[in-house]
């Protein structure tokens, strides 16, 4: 999910179908740098609306300041608390480690993509393998 609508649809669906009354929906996401700035507020608002806990992190920030991107996303949260961890691997690790029985962790933005752009350099990235490593599977 790279758009406010995509985030809304996946989080709303997961909340309705999988999150039990005592479980929480944990969302890890970011927004790409040097792309549509106007969607960031709405992405934050979507996560604030449907997730219980949100981690805002990097997602191909390119040459844009990742903290600025996080701040623009954060504006969509209004008064609702959210967490910022600009290192994507650390954000995913923290979200997974904090999850309890019946919680669901949703990570949006990178999925099948095989690189993570930081500055002008494309670094190898495998989100699925990252999650498997954290879960030790």
Residue ranges with predicted function:
Residues 1-137:
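ATP-dependent carboxylate-amine ligase
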């Amino acid at each position: 999910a790279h758009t406010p609508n995509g985030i809304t649809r996946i989080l709303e669906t997961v909340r309705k179908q999988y999150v039990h009354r005592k479980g929480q929906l944990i969302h890890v996401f970011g927004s790409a740098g040097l792309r549509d700035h106007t969607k960031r507020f709405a992405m934050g608002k979507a996560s604030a609306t449907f997730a219980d806990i949100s981690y805002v992190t990097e997602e191909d920030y390119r040459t844009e300041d990742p903290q600025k991107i996080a701040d623009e996303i954060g504006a969509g949260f209004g008064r609702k608390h959210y967490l910022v961890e600009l290192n994507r691997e650390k954000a995913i690790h923290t979200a997974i480690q904090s999850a309890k029985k019946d919680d669901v962790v949703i990570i949006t933005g990178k999925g099948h993509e095989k690189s993570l752009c930081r500055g002008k350099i494309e670094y190898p990235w495998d989100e699925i393998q990252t999650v498997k490593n954290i879960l030790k599977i």
